[in-house]
Design a protein with these regions (language model features):
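Short, well-ordered coil/turn segments that N-cap beta-strands
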Residues: 25-29, 83-85, 134-137, 160-163, ...
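Extended recognition/assembly regions associated with phosphoester-bond processing machinery
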Residues: 2-25, 70, 78-86, 226, ...
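Short acidic/histidine-rich active-site segments
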Residues: 88-92, 139-143, 164-168, 190-209
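C-terminal helical cap
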Residues: 144-146, 164-182, 231-254
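Acidic (Asp/Glu)-rich catalytic clusters
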Residues: 20-27, 127-131, 154-159, 184-189
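Divalent metal-binding pocket/active-site signature
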Residues: 29-147
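Mid-to-C-terminal alpha-helical segments outside catalytic/metal-binding sites
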Residues: 190-191, 208-258
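Histidine/acidic-residue-rich catalytic or RNA/ligand-binding cores of hydrolases
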Residues: 41-43, 97-106, 148-156, 174-181, ...
């Protein structure tokens, strides 16, 4: 797409950097990475090149692929520190689970199933290198709700670069949103979340989804007021944050005109 010849791992990263610059020039502020697992590892340049050439020659094993993908996530994080694009990570979907559907109709026909996902160990190399870098910002999503309070909330509460994305896909629902707030907020707080964003291709559903998210957040905030955990002025401030301010801050959108 950019006319470059990609014959090496270094050339691949350079080509991706070029595409990132192109999208940024059109107003993009974030990248999005879909992986089966959020495994990260920093490889020596010669090892990354060896795995790249094995893949080009059709000789790469499943472990080779796993290690190279882990290295590329590290490279994408590095590029984010250079170009300022927010790094989004959507792990944990086993794509095309139904082999018969895949063979007849091809990929991405609705047979994508969540799998258990481990973040704490898998992201440690990336977060040790970039988690406290003020140039870096990462938004984490999950399909494994068991990780909300055990892993994601503590990670976001510790690393300044992390924000937790809203409930995603199967959990983008009334009960999914309720579970998210209950499991995340006590440890991660409110201001370590990304507010409610929307990456759906179902364009006409966007207003309804935002309406549902705002109603669910209002219900949750109202519950905090009813239990005398916060006051009304604090509730109004939180409502503004979760609906508008956190998203604009997370994705580095220009400030709104007064």
């Amino acid at each position: 797409m950019n006319g470059a010849t990609i014959g090496s791992s270094e050339a691949l990263v350079a080509a991706l950097a070029g595409r990132r610059r192109y999208f940024a020039s059109l107003g993009a502020t974030a990248t999005d990475h879909g992986v089966l697992e959020p495994y990260t590892a920093e490889l020596a340049p010669e090892e990354a090149e060896r795995l790249f050439q094995k893949a080009r020659n059709g000789e790469a094993t499943a472990d080779d692929q796993r290690r190279y993908e882990a290295h590329m996530l590290m490279e994408m994080a590095r590029l984010s520190t250079e170009d300022g694009l927010v790094m989004q990570l959507h792990p944990g979907s086993l794509r095309d689970h139904n082999s018969a559907v895949w063979q007849r109709f091809g990929p991405d026909k609705g047979a994508d199933i969540p799998v258990a996902t481990e973040f704490t160990r898998n992201l440690r190399p990336l977060l040790n290198k970039y988690g406290t870098d003020p140039r870096f910002s990462m938004v984490l999503f999950t399909l494994d709700e068991s990780t909300y309070s055990r892993e994601l909330a503590p990670l976001a509460g510790h690393y300044p670069a992390l924000r937790l994305g809203p409930p995603w896909w199967f959990h983008d629902s009334i009960e999914g949103m309720r579970r998210y707030r209950e499991q995340v907020s006590e440890t991660a707080g409110i201001y370590n979340t990304a507010g409610f964003n929307d990456d759906t291709r179902a364009f006409c559903s966007i207003p309804a989804r935002h309406d549902l998210a705002r109603r669910m957040d209002a219900n949750w905030i109202g519950g905090l007021v009813a239990r005398h955990i916060i006051e009304m002025d604090e509730a109004r401030e939180i409502a503004q944050a979760v609906t508008v301010d956190l998203v604009r801050e997370t994705y580095r959108f220009p400030a709104m005109e007064a």
